[in-house]
Amino acid sequence: MFNVCPDCGEYRADKIIVPEGAYAVCPNCGFQHRFIRLPLFILTGASGVGKTTACLALAAKLKECVVMESDILWRDEFNQPATDYRNYRETWLRVCKNISQAGKPVVLCGAGVPAQFEQCIERRYFSNVHYLALVCEDETLTSRLRNRPAWRGSSKDEYVEEHLKFNRWLIDNAQDTQPPMTLLNTAEITVDESVAAVERWIHSHLNGE
């Protein structure tokens, strides 16, 4: 929707954002399209750290934001590791951009790291992108994955190892990404405490925007 210029009709994702962020300029005809530039919140982490649980609770409690689970758009066509899943990230940023035009920022829950989003063409449409990574200790994550329902297929050794590796990477590299990620260890806190911590993190950035 937003990528189509109302004046010339061209589809351009690479619109030029004016300094104050109130307009996106069509590179084809120069038309200034007014839009709302809001922050985006990315809630990331390995499988089993509590993203989906937090997402469900936040959707019911966080009325000032739109909370979404990124897996709902996953299709085989997006399984492109050679591009670091670029089309998948661009698609989600485009969805979040359009939703935010209703005046509410989006909280997107799903695995991902800053490098996968910050390089995207659609990134320019957000005032900031804030990243919170849920993590936990190896033993806790292993137990959670192996005790999930069988249909999820998360008890297999290779699946467990893959997500242990990603979890460790987040812990080791959170401060070195651009921008840095905030870490939240969910191992020793309840679900309610975890959700409350995510809420505080979101509100702290909303109040600072």
At which residue positions do the language-model features occur?
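Small-molecule kinase domains that catalyze NTP-dependent phosphoryl transfer to phosphate-bearing small molecules
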Residues: 151-197, 209
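Short cysteine-rich clusters marking metal-coordination/redox-active sites
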Residues: 5-8, 26-29
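Walker A (P-loop) phosphate-binding loop of P-loop NTPases
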Residues: 48
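Conserved substrate/cofactor phosphate-moiety recognition/catalytic segment
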Residues: 55-97
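Glycine-rich phosphate-binding loop used to anchor ATP phosphates in small-molecule kinases
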Residues: 87-129
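Conserved lysine of the Walker
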Residues: 51
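Conserved phosphate-donor/acceptor-positioning beta-strand/loop module used by diverse small-molecule
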Residues: 125-147, 184
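Hydrophobic anchor at the beta1->P-loop junction of P-loop NTPases
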Residues: 43
